Amino acid sequence: MGTKELHIVMYPWLAFGHFIPYLHLSNKLAQKGHKITFLLPHRAKLQLDSQNLYPSLITLVPITVPQVDTLPLGAESTADIPLSQHGDLSIAMDRTRPEIESILSKLDPKPDLIFFDMAQWVPVIASKLGIKSVSYNIVCAISLDLVRDWYKKDDGSNVPSWTLKHDKSSHFGENISILERALIALGTPDAIGIRSCREIEGEYCDSIAERFKKPVLLSGTTLPEPSDDPLDPKWVKWLGKFEEGSVIFCCLGSQHVLDKPQLQELALGLEMTGLPFFLAIKPPLGYATLDEVLPEGFSERVRDRGVAHGGWVQQPQMLAHPSVGCFLCHCGSSSMWEALVSDTQLVLFPQIPDQALNAVLMADKLKVGVKVEREDDGGVSKEVWSRAIKSVMDKESEIAAEVKKNHTKWRDMLINEEFVNGYIDSFIKDLQDLVEK
């Protein structure tokens, strides 16, 4: 059994949706006495310094993201670009390889392990330096296990046709597709790590281990402790006007932006429910504010019970407020886990293939929420939005009762302190054993 204090390097994909879960894991590992060297762009370091809870053990090391001609000047992460340019950002990430190798070769003490996700070349340089590599994935095991088969069904059989616009062959770097990159990243390291637990995704984890012939190490959800930062007083005051569990909180993430017609249907669907709601969503591309695209007369009609906010909101704090009773989410992996540990009814609106698979897990396997049904072109009418929300918010609804019962069961398990600590302790032991092999 391993007992070694580890030195682990973290190099996640250049996105805050990856930096932050990697930092949450780093805090959990440092809490147990392990040393972390975390590689990330300069501006991201400045933004995340305050979330480093163990600065004596976690060192955030800034790296330079090389300029790519097709990207805006100074782009360092997905926060600086639209979704359509993520493939070009991966070119920039690949061009960090010489700097990453140089840093790894000079670190003292020498690292035992390096965690990565999208930089599929990491195992090559790690092996050369005598460092074990772990493909640590914040996406769910169901996505890792099934996404290849999902993409293979090019005729659209058994998959929603709206997902087919996300092309498996689209470039994600120079002369490499996103699918090729993912398969190399999973097939070449010493182990595969996943932010998940066996109770929820055991069958998919076993399938991944068999498919890639690699040990699969599970860290648990590694969600942070509840934040000491209070919810913005403005929103506390607004939410305080409504009954417990009555407010719909809709937050669809920053990766995919609805177009104007779809955003209007969503807004009208929220209005049709008759319930108070908080819509946090970015304006469509080409528009500076939500006011430019909301339906005519909408703001006036809902002024006493609805907020449409185009900026950032504190999602965990919003979900923890007692007035919030429904979470309409996009099923990104982090939001999925935050949803599962919340005490809200769940409505699921995935927007890209891995989110769609997460929604399958949530709605079909765990039965903790309902999916919003799309047309073949991906569209959703206001009536469908309203119907999905009402199905989980109507106190007389059998669906509402079922998803609440199932959600409570899984939530109670996931927030159990012994359960959480057991996973991180087992994960560390597995890493120690891997290093000592």
Curated annotation (Swiss-Prot):
What residues make up the catalytic site? Answer: H18 (proton acceptor), D117 (charge relay)
- Keyword terms: Glycosyltransferase, Transferase
Name the organs or tissues of expression.
Mainly expressed in flowers, flower buds and young leaves, and, to a lesser extent, in old leaves, stems and roots.
Q: What is its EC number?
A: 2.4.1.-
Which GO terms are recorded in the biological process aspect for this UniProt protein? glycosylation; saponin biosynthetic process; triterpenoid biosynthetic process
- Describe its applied uses: Soapwort saponins possess anticancer properties and are also being explored as enhancers for endosomal escape in targeted tumor therapies. They may also serve as precursors for vaccine adjuvants.
Pathway annotation from the record: Secondary metabolite biosynthesis; terpenoid biosynthesis
Say yes or no: keyword Glycosyltransferase present. yes
Q: Which InterPro entries match?
A: UDP-glycosyltransf_plant (IPR050481), UDP_glucos_trans (IPR002213), UDP_glycos_trans_CS (IPR035595)
Record-level Gene Ontology MF annotations: UDP-glucosyltransferase activity; UDP-glycosyltransferase activity
For the keyword Transferase, the answer is: yes
Question: Which enzyme type, at the first EC level?
Answer: transferase
Q: In terms of domain of life, where is this protein from?
A: Eukaryota
Name the residues that bind UDP.
Answer: S254, W312, V313, H330, S335, E338
**What does it do?**
Component of the oleanane-type triterpene saponins (e.g. saponarioside A and saponarioside B) biosynthetic pathway, leading to the production of natural products with detergent properties used as traditional sources of soap.
Family assignment from sequence similarity: Belongs to the UDP-glycosyltransferase family.
Name under which the protein is recorded:
UDP-glucosyl transferase 79L3
Instruction: Name its species.
Output: Saponaria officinalis
